[in-house]
Amino acid sequence: MLFAIGNAGSNIVETIRKESENAALKKIRNVFADCDENDLKKHKAEDCQLIHLNKDEDEFPNEIFDGIEKLVIVTGLGGKTGTKYAELAAKSAVDAGVTSVNVIATLPFFFEGNNRINLATSAARKLTDINGMNVTIVNNEEILEKYPDLDFFNAFDATDKKIMQIVKDIL
């Protein structure tokens, strides 16, 4: 299962869904979860499941992971939805007995401000403290440093492609 949480995660998984030529990625179950119902509607398709999250909930429904052996959660950290629900979903998946739980999370750009960066860093630490799963952190700022000619929008594309490769390697 490829599980997108929040706007950043959903945008990344949508790119993977549309652009990947990989047979395994074409067959995988795509799930999009967000607190914003309008954002969820952007990902409505026959091969996708949509989950509207209640921003006041502090639990995650375990039943979503019934029968799942391999899970890849994709999210951005530093905002509200991904920061909160990546941890809840990961714990829920581990508790539900998912054999392979992987979280791929992005860190914000510097220009997004210290509040988002601090929130993301704290969330990344919490994710790495969960036993029974793998966490990969993709730092958007490092992508800009590696490819200084990229503008802001192309940096997102580079991040999406990097994460697509990580997902392929996991599957």
State each model region's role.
Residues 1-171:
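Tubulin/FtsZ superfamily GTPase core signature
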